[in-house]
């Protein structure tokens, strides 16, 4: 009977927690809206008055993985919603955010997410000037082409970085796809730019990538604070793996020790797949099969 009572209490607490969570919008808490407003203000300074900036957020994930926003879109908005768009008008320094509409059925399983219906809340959390559904974006783009001079449209011409990704590795992957005669994959950014040029040929398309790259090199105090926290977690994970090392352990088990420390302390995952190499495997700088003996490890 005691076991049944405990299970019932836990079940009721779980249900109550789940019901409370349904009314909470999922949003990052590391940066205030002023941080993103400041970044967008610097973009306006770089592109000038006769320009618009159009940024495409990451698509939804396939399969049972957690969505992660692209680095570039998150850097300017903090928004972690799939299929979002950002439009910045250099003429009047206004910013419009475009989100999908609420999917009540999906939210019953995944929790409440930012949507086009959450105007006041989204503006408060992100500091943007306007919120619209994504279907409004084509109409708003056409407004810039009613009369010349037409503004220059800035967007990403390089692949956007996602979870555990870097641009050099993404470019290597695209090069491999191009060399495969059976793989006709085109980068999502390439398809987006082609769509812009087809639908709105009056726009001169320019690359936003160098501007964001230069901005992201210089870290704000809040970014430095997060980097220090992540570095401390990396050190804690390495120390835990070292303490756990003993004869007979496999590489993947040591990898799991460090990852446990990351996750239990609030990290969403690794910056990259750990390099946990033992024996002769340690000679390979980016080895990740994790099935040898003596260990050389890199975690982040």
Regions found by a protein language model. Give the residues of each.
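Hydrophobic alpha-helical segments
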Residues: 16-19, 291-293
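Juxtamembrane/interface motifs at transmembrane-helix termini
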Residues: 107, 116-118, 246-248, 273-275
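C-terminal helix-coil-helix/basic helical segment that borders enzyme active sites and/or dimer interfaces
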Residues: 30, 239-249
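Short catalytic-site patches enriched in acidic/histidine residues
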Residues: 61-68, 73-75, 194, 206-213, ...
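Structural signal for well-ordered, non-membrane alpha-helices
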Residues: 235, 239-242, 259
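A composition/biophysics-driven feature that prefers long, compositionally simple stretches
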Residues: 2-5, 10-13, 19-236
């Amino acid at each position: 009977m005691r076991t049944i009572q405990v299970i019932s209490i836990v079940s009721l607490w779980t249900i109550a927690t789940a019901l409370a969570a349904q009314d909470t919008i999922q949003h990052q808490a590391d940066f205030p809206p002023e941080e993103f407003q400041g970044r967008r203000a610097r973009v306006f300074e770089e592109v000038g008055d006769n320009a618009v900036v159009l940024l495409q957020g990451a698509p939804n994930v396939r399969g049972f993985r957690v969505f992660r926003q692209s680095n570039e879109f998150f850097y300017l908005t903090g928004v972690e919603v799939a299929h979002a768009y950002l439009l910045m008008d250099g003429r009047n320094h206004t910013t419009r955010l475009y989100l999908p509409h609420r999917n009540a059925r999906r939210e019953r399983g995944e929790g409440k997410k930012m949507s086009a219906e959450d105007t006041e809340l989204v503006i408060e959390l992100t500091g943007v000037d306007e919120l619209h559904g994504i279907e409004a974006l084509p109409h708003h783009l056409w407004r810039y082409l009613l009369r010349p001079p037409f503004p220059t449209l800035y967007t990403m011409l390089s692949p956007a970085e996602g979870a555990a990704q870097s641009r050099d590795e993404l470019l290597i992957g695209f090069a491999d796809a191009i060399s495969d005669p059976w793989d006709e994959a085109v980068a999502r950014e390439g398809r987006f730019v082609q769509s812009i040029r087809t639908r709105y040929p009056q726009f001169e398309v320019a690359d936003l990538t160098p501007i964001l790259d230069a901005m992201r090199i210089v870290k704000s105090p809040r970014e430095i604070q997060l980097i220090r926290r992540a570095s401390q977690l990396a050190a804690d994970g390495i120390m835990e793996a070292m303490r756990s090392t003993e004869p007979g352990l496999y590489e993947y088990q040591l990898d799991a020790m460090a990852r446990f420390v990351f996750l239990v302390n609030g990290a969403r995952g690794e910056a990259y797949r750990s390099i946990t190499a033992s024996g002769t495997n340690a000679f390979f700088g980016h080895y990740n099969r994790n099935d040898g003996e003596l260990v050389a490890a890199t975690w982040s």
